[in-house]
From Swiss-Prot:
Phosphorylated on Tyr residues after T-cell receptor triggering by LCK in association with CD4/CD8. This is T-cell surface glycoprotein CD3 epsilon chain. Disulfide bonds join 49-91. Residues 150-196 are annotated as: Disordered. One of its GO terms (biological process) is cell surface receptor signaling pathway. Keywords: Adaptive immunity, Cell membrane, Disulfide bond, Immunity, Immunoglobulin domain, Membrane, Phosphoprotein, Receptor, Signal, Transmembrane, Transmembrane helix. The chain crosses the membrane at residues 117-137.
């Protein structure tokens, strides 16, 4: 059997064993899956106990010290502080088994929760706007450049523009670059003669 087919058969065997093993997982009862519900809004944290208090009082403890007692299954912690309010929270209804939760949360008054799709949308829109502005600037500068420099080359003009520019007088010579007179015996006039 070629080695390619061997790997395919081995892969199918592993997949079937994995699927067969998943069927044997026991599903826990709904009673054992009860969990706390934690809601954070601004600097407030609301804990909801998985037990219903029915007609008895519910006792809330933090680090095994009683902090709250009510007939509701939730507790609201206002002005939550990560340092002061973090710890193990337990809720107990009467003499029933208590549920434990370790809570450590960072909160702030003016925080806004942003989901992943909002962040991706903001980034994509920002990139599109930036590219759009880049293209507008490119095409605008390209069209202005074409209007500013007309390319007209005539056969007899030698590549120079025609019209009024042709009648323009030559530029005024700069006094710093005056030509050396033949009557002067300066350093530069001597160098010039040796070079010939």
């Amino acid at each position: 059997m070629p080695s390619g087919n061997l790997w395919k058969v081995l892969g199918l065997c592993l997949l079937s064993v994995g699927a067969w093993g998943q069927e044997d997982i026991e599903r826990p009862d709904e009673d054992t899956q009860k969990t706390f519900k934690v809601s954070i809004s601004g600097d407030k944290v609301e804990l909801t106990c998985p037990e219903d208090p029915e007609s008895e009082k519910m006792t809330w403890k933090r680090n095994d010290m009683q902090i709250y007692e009510s007939y509701d299954n939730y507790m609201l912690l206002e002005s939550f502080s990560e340092v002061e309010n973090s710890g193990y929270y337990t809720c107990t209804v009467g003499e029933k088994t208590s549920h434990r939760l370790y809570l450590k949360a960072r909160v702030c008054e003016n925080c806004v929760e942003v989901d992943l799709m909002a962040v991706v949308t903001i980034i994509v829109v920002d990139i599109c706007i930036t590219l759009g502005l880049l293209m507008v600037v490119y095409y605008y500068s390209k069209s202005r450049k074409a209007k500013a420099m007309p390319v007209t080359r005539g056969a007899g003009a030698g590549g120079r523009p025609r019209g009024q520019n042709r009648e323009r007088p030559p530029p005024v010579p700069n006094p710093d670059y005056e030509p050396i007179r033949k009557g002067q015996r300066d350093l530069y006039s001597g160098l010039n003669q040796r070079g010939r």
